[in-house]
UniProtKB/Swiss-Prot annotation:
Pfam families with a match to the protein in the record: ABC_tran, TOBE
Upper taxonomic lineage: Bacteria, Pseudomonadati, Pseudomonadota, Gammaproteobacteria, Pasteurellales
UniProt similarity note: Belongs to the ABC transporter superfamily. Molybdate importer (TC 3.A.1.8) family.
GO MF annotations in UniProt: ABC-type molybdate transporter activity; ATP binding; ATP hydrolysis activity
Subcellular location: Cell inner membrane
Organism of derivation: Mannheimia succiniciproducens (strain KCTC 0769BP / MBEL55E)
Function: Part of the ABC transporter complex ModABC involved in molybdenum import. Responsible for energy coupling to the transport system.
Gene Ontology annotations for the cellular component aspect, listed alphabetically: plasma membrane
Membrane topology field: Peripheral membrane protein
Residues covered by the Mop domain: 290-352
Catalytic activity: molybdate(out) + ATP + H2O = molybdate(in) + ADP + phosphate + H(+)
Location of the ABC transporter domain: 2-230
Name the UniProt record assigns to this protein: Molybdenum import ATP-binding protein ModC
Length: 352
């Protein structure tokens, strides 16, 4: 299963030119600054707008092919769409909204989706009585119950306040693990990208600047505008190794070494995404005998980037890499050089 996109579309002064093959599972984040063509890209997939030229294929079906005069209507594409606003029917109950558009009602599947989204207690209520987060959960349920081959989500959290965003993010994380269809997710929020996206399409002025896993793209110069000024960081996906319930800590496997974080929910082997900022990493040439820092990992220097009165140091920890920011004074005193074995003292780890 996959989505193949090869289209051009003029949108006022912007020309959207996209050529992509998106995997048939997981969440692909569509990311970029405002006006880069994010929403237009998924509207082309949905059929709400048509390309000037090109084609889009979903699995073995051609959705549109301008050269061969093929154009399936939106309702023929078997694609679910969740908009920024829930767009529920006010005169239908929650159950009525959920059932709208179902071709063949399946009670078992209905119950599964309702439980997954935590909306069992809302079925008899009407949209006017729901919070913004509840409305969006109902909208997501309605889209899923149409049994789509793909789900499109256009900034579904943008109209919500922070508590509701956090609430719905937790449901979206759960959703991504439970359903077996690809999701295209438009956002301009780094937090949503970190929490949800397996892959990222970075759009810049209508063109695909990059398409890769979030972990790889985060290291790219293309993502520097979104990183904290003057600070480098590494985004890693690591499996849970074990838990220490006495100290309320969880060990993640980083190469062949352990990285301790605050206690997490999850079985051994579950993958967790983390971020390590360069300002939270210091360097020592020997293992400290007594220290409060729990994460001291051995590695090798692979890059030295002088910058003003500091040096950014990239350290390889097996196949993974992190950054440390040290003063020029410290770098000279330690005589840091590429290929040198060092110990990275990691003072803080952010779990996404």
């Amino acid at each position: 299963m996959m989505l193949e996109i090869n289209v051009k579309k003029r949108l006022g002064q912007l020309v959207l030119n996209a050529r992509l093959t998106i995997p048939g599972q997981g969440i692909t984040g569509i990311f970029g600054i405002s006006g880069s063509g994010k929403s237009s890209l998924i509207n082309l997939v949905s059929g709400l707008i048509h390309p000037d030229e090109g084609n889009i294929r979903l699995n073995d079906r051609t959705l549109i092919d301008t050269a061969n005069n093929i154009c399936l209507a939106p309702n023929q594409r078997n694609i679910g769409y969740v908009f920024q606003d829930a767009r529920l029917f006010p005169h239908y109950s929650v159950k009525g909204n959920l059932c709208y558009g179902i071709k063949r009602f399946n009670q078992q599947e209905f119950n599964r989706i309702v439980r997954l989204l935590g909306i069992e207690h809302l079925l008899a209520r009407y949209p006017l009585t729901l919070s913004g987060g509840e409305k969006q959960r109902v909208a997501i349920g309605r889209a899923l119950l149409s049994n789509p081959e793909m789900l499109l989500m256009d900034e579904p959290l943008s109209a919500l306040d922070l508590p509701r965003k956090r609430e719905l993010l937790a449901y979206l994380e759960k959703l991504s693990q439970e359903i077996n269809i690809p999701i295209l997710y438009v956002t301009h929020s780094l937090d949503e990208l970190f929490r949800l996206a397996d892959f990222v399409v970075l759009l810049d002025e209508g063109k695909v600047a990059a398409f890769d896993s979030l972990e790889n793209l985060w290291q790219s110069p293309l993502f520097e505008p979104w990183q904290e000024q003057g600070q480098k960081s590494a985004v890693l996906s690591l499996p849970i190794l074990n838990h220490n319930f006495s100290y309320k800590m969880t060990a993640l496997l980083l190469g062949e070494q352990q990285l301790w974080v605050k206690l997490l929910n999850g079985d051994e082997g579950k993958t967790v995404r983390i971020c390590i900022r360069s300002t939270d990493v210091s360097i020592t040439l020997t293992v400290p005998e007594k220290t409060s820092i729990r994460n001291i990992l051995s590695g090798k220097i692979i890059t030295l980037l002088p910058k003003g009165n500091q040096v950014d140091v990239k350290i390889a920890l097996g196949k993974d890499e992190i950054w440390a920011s040290v003063s020029t004074w410290a770098a000279e005193e330690l005589q840091l050089q590429i290929g040198q074995s060092v110990y990275a003292q990691i003072k803080a780890v952010s779990v996404m």
